[in-house]
Amino acid sequence: MNYKDTLLMPKTDFPMRGGLPNKEPQIQEMWDNDEQYRKALEKNKNNPSFILHDGPPYANGNLHMGHALNKIIKDFIVRYKTMQGFYAPYVPGWDTHGLPIEQALTKKGVDRKKMSVAEFREKCKEFALKQIDIQKKDFKRLGVRGDFNNPYITLTPEYEAAQIRLFGEMADKGLIYKGKKPVYWSPSSESSLAEAEIEYHDKRSASIYVAFDVKDSKGKVDSDAQFIIWTTTPWTIPSNVAITVHPELNYGQYNVNGHKYIVAQALSEAVAEALGWDKDSIQLEKEFTGKELEFVEAQHPFLDRVSLVINGEHVTTDAGTGCVHTAPGHGEDDYIVGQKYDLPVISPLNDKGVFTEEGGPFEGMFYDKANKAVTDLLKEKDALLKLDFITHSYPHDWRTKKPVIFRATPQWFASINKVRQDILDAIEDTNFKVDWGKTRIYNMIRDRGEWVISRQRVWGVPLPVFYAENGDIIMTKETVNHVADLFEKYGSNIWFEKEAKELLPEGFSHPGSPNGEFTKETDIMDVWFDSGSSHRGVLETRPELSFPADLYFEGSDQYRGWFNSSITTAVATRGQAPYKFLLSHGFVMDGEGKKMSKSLGNVIVPDQVVKQKGADIARLWVSSTDYLSDVRISDEILKQTSDVYRKIRNTLRFMLGNINDFNPETDSIAETNLLEVDRYLLNRLREFTASTINNYENFDYLNIYQEVQNFINVELSNFYLDYGKDILYIEKKDSHKRRSMQTVLYQILIDMTKLLAPILVHTAEEVWSHTPHVKEESVHLSDMPKVVDVDEELLEKWNTFMNLRDDVNRALEQARNEKVIGKSLEAKVVIGNNETFNTAEFLQQFNDLQQLFIVSQVEVKDKVNDGVSYQYGDIHIKHAEGEKCERCWNYTEELGSVGELEHLCPRCQEVVKTLV
């Protein structure tokens, strides 16, 4: 007889190889055909909701790993919440306005000047919608589930109308105003920028020290003294109208070889060193506070203009001279302090950053090129004390990567000052996973200036503002709501297709327009106002959603971006934050922590990972990251992830193979009748389940990744599944011992598949489809396992046993090295007490020790004379006695000797008898 045919070997159609790149699209097609998203919502429609509001990615370009990290974690969250019984809709969104799309069209050869604004905007819209289709397909390929057939898009008429109404409410509250202020201006984009659109890069700049003659000393300083200022923007000197000193700082008039200079005393040594003064030739002649210097008049170095000495709290002693060159047209602090002294705001540059006629001798020069001309003129006037060059961190346009300037222009602003404290209070009421997240957004709101919401572009939502014949601003509830209604019906392009009069309510009149003529604003809104209105345009308008959202989750750059603009508009109009909980993730770097770039050849993109390895590998990688900080990815890291995936898959496959003849309805053993080892594993499963559920609740996916591996490797592979082979393959099919183990194996398989489902979405579905007797059609329509109390006493007892078993394994390994045995079934374990542990008494509580140790024989004694002492006993390994059973390979002294049952142990004889 071929005894192999009598073994109950694992049977399953679940393949060992994942073949994910080919299999996943088939699973996704099945989900779409089955309308799984709709069914998941339907299942929980009467339950409490959980709303994760999607921050809209920009509809331009292919997905990068940051997109994948973001969308996959969102999918973890929403799928988990759904399996916990929450009504958890997920509405993906896209941000569609702004300069990058205008630039993309220009690169494609679209000439803006050859068409109307409305026609160009139509092309922008077509481009954005095509980009959305591409990104949508790629997001779905990552296994992300959501309402992709009905996403929110910031260019749709209903969204734009909601944005206009929100703007109108802010205007009603006096939070929208027009003013001439210095704002970040990008000559390369020819537009103003918000703080969120600024990034810092190193830039080489001129560093100059300039002397300003005293014109009117007011009897405080010598009339032949000079104030020294320091600046890295020589091109702003033509706009200088003041020198700012700190009222409480001490200043000195220093005589240096007959020249008299005024600087802050705390900076005198640094200035002396910078200007190369001989220390022995420096004399402090006079001392005064900054307050005493107020209203002294200096002379502009080359213009017929007074430079007034004023006081400002923003002056520091970190660098420079303590006498700050002040040009209100080119600096926020300068502007604010200038307002107090009613200083003129001079800003002689055009939109391209070129000097206008107001710039005098510099007319027609690009501001950066004017640096040399200004410096040369200062030198000619003997006002230049030092010219040097420094490399420093400087603001750049985040899209064009070109330097920006501060430039005073007429702009529209949303007031932060009026709602700042309310926003800070709302942040206090918001929950954060990490304290630094709260600190970060709190400090940004606390320190930010007024929000410039106007942009001098065409692809965006128009500012719904009209002007009367006399220049009066018209921005009333009636006019704004009328524009909103028009946008909702026709889209915002109507603003560029119709005259102002046609966009106003019928019969509208205004005292400032006696002839009934009106003009309309040509600026559009900052794109951060677009996405920052999503709580109104999406949460409050989609019937399946609600305000405020339970969670906003985006990259950490959104503390200054979407998180910031959203809470500003929500607090301004609704008096509360649009989110209850705020969570962020870091950026994706290469394997060495460097930024990915084509030049370094270290770029990995989602499409490549999905095609080569599969979306589940990308998702498992995401779960393996500490996403709160920057994360790393490389081919080597993905290879390690694939190895972990293979281990998980093979473990699930082993369990599937060994429950193929098990029906939980008819074959399950009641928990009280399970073998104790099986009850131990059931309790370990419950511990693992409770920990995993807790980790999902706290968004701790790295913990899940590590604990899944630990449970699979330590509890299952290294012990239970290995121990179980002797039972599952060898015992009689429906023996109590085998059914007891299958009962627990089935439970482990079901629960593990559910617990892995939010992460390994495709693999979990595949496992589910191969699992016999499951009730739900999809694992994603099932519920998470319930958290159940564990038997602490049982766990404590078996945890001690597992430690003892580790000692036995060490002894077996030693015996293997010494060639006493080969495989562990060739061993007889002799074990007894040591000085610290009563091994013999402890082991009396356990049956079938030879199976638990995976050896042929175990002898427990009080004392083992020739044993090696381990923590849990003295152990001696001998070769097993007797001969090897040809069916189970255990050694015994009771082999059968006749007929069919020859060379079988008594247990195998009993089993085979029933098969013959």
Swiss-Prot record:
One of its GO terms (biological process) is isoleucyl-tRNA aminoacylation. Pfam families: Anticodon_1, tRNA-synt_1, zf-FPG_IleRS. A motif ('KMSKS' region) lies at residues 595-599. It catalyses: tRNA(Ile) + L-isoleucine + ATP = L-isoleucyl-tRNA(Ile) + AMP + diphosphate. A motif ('HIGH' region) lies at residues 57-67. ATP binds at residue 598. L-isoleucyl-5'-AMP binds at residue 554. Catalyzes the attachment of isoleucine to tRNA(Ile). As IleRS can inadvertently accommodate and process structurally similar amino acids such as valine, to avoid such errors it has two additional distinct tRNA(Ile)-dependent editing activities. One activity is designated as 'pretransfer' editing and involves the hydrolysis of activated Val-AMP. The other activity is designated 'posttransfer' editing and involves deacylation of mischarged Val-tRNA(Ile). This is Isoleucine--tRNA ligase. It comes from Staphylococcus epidermidis (strain ATCC 12228 / FDA PCI 1200). The gene is ileS.
